[in-house]
């Protein structure tokens, strides 16, 4: 057994907002992909903390419903803005609208717009992988550079936080377009951290492990969402999956002035999933050994060590 059987005892889920009230007062925060899932959770937390939140995506009807929910639950400011990250002209138009409605260029950008699906790579058409690259990599670049140009021209600072994935660093089968794109976003993060800090902009990323949302899990896994999640818990050492509110708290902290010295960081947020076997091909088998097997192995090692000592005398 490689994972904790009692996560509720040792690793409880805390969904309340972590930062003090007012921690983001006076900030304008733009969250792409903000209508659902992780983006919605992040936008909600930001509104709780006093930010004027702009949520952006293609479907205005979804955004309007989410904005109403966030305003109702937080008493804060949340406005919907239609944006297609694949189209630089539409990105610029959305920024114009945000500035007009909320007063100025965003102080915080959350790059959360994404697209993904599981498929054998040899079955992917150029259009299929091109769509993912257009959204995840090129779309993130469109939004980030639009913000950057405006901030540099206006001599404004900003915090840019991109949501990537664990396999951006390791690679993963059957999600090649997403892996390629997210790896590019992480390299953009580190590159701009060194290039644009002189202009007052800082760049970081969160690489989450499995955090169930209807959108992400629905696209990636066959069957019911719950079944997909239950099967994945065994791969996470802490014995449970993440929750959107948890990544929202981390995003708020990293985006806030409390973390103004953090720049160029990629933060893994996965319950230890990537380290479960520590790169050892034996790890998955060793977790299943009982005390008898370990005692047998210890005796073999002691016996071998004793023979080696005698041979040297």
UniProtKB/Swiss-Prot annotation:
Gene Ontology BP annotations: defense response to Gram-negative bacterium; fatty acid beta-oxidation; innate immune response
Protein origin, superkingdom: Eukaryota
One Pfam family recorded for the sequence: adh_short_C2
Classification via InterPro entries: NAD(P)-bd_dom_sf, SDR_fam
Enzyme Commission code(s) on record: 1.-.-.-
Binding site for NADP(+): 29-61
CC per GO annotation: mitochondrion
GO MF term set: 2,4-dienoyl-CoA reductase (NADPH) activity
Keywords: NADP, Oxidoreductase
Coiled coil: none
Keyword presence, Metal-binding: no
Similarity comment: family membership: Belongs to the short-chain dehydrogenases/reductases (SDR) family. 2,4-dienoyl-CoA reductase subfamily.
Protein name as it appears in the record: Uncharacterized oxidoreductase F53C11.3
């Amino acid at each position: 057994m490689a994972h904790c059987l009692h996560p509720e005892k040792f690793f409880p889920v805390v969904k309340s907002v972590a930062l003090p009230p007012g921690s983001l007062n006076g900030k304008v925060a733009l969250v792409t992909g903000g209508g659902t899932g992780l983006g919605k959770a992040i936008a909600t937390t930001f509104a709780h903390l006093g930010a004027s939140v702009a949520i952006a995506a293609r479907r205005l009807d979804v955004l309007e419903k989410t904005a109403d929910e966030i305003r109702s639950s937080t008493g804060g400011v949340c406005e919907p803005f239609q944006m297609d990250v694949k189209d630089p002209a539409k990105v610029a138009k959305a920024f114009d609208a945000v500035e007009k409605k909320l007063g100025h260029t965003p102080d915080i950008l959350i790059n959360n717009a994404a697209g993904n699906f599981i498929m054998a790579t040899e079955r992917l058409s150029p259009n299929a992988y091109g769509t993912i690259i257009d959204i995840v990599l090129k779309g993130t670049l469109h939004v980030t550079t639009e913000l950057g140009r405006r901030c540099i021209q206006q001599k404004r600072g900003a915090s840019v936080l991109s949501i990537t994935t664990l396999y951006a660093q390791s690679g993963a089968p059957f999600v090649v377009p997403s892996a390629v794109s997210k790896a590019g976003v992480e390299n953009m993060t580190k590159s701009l951290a060194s290039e644009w800090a002189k202009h007052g902009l800082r760049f970081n990323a969160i690489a989450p492990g499995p955090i169930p949302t209807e959108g992400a899990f629905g696209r990636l896994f066959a069957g019911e969402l719950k079944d997909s999640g239950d099967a994945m818990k065994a791969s996470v050492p802490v014995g449970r999956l993440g929750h959107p509110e948890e990544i929202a708290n981390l995003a708020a902290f990293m985006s806030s002035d409390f973390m103004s010295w953090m720049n160029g960081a990629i933060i893994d947020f996965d319950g230890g999933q990537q380290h479960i076997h520590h790169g050892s091909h034996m790890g998955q088998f060793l977790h299943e050994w009982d005390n008898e097997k370990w005692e047998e192995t210890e005796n073999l090692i002691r016996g071998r060590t004793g023979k080696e000592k005698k041979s040297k005398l």
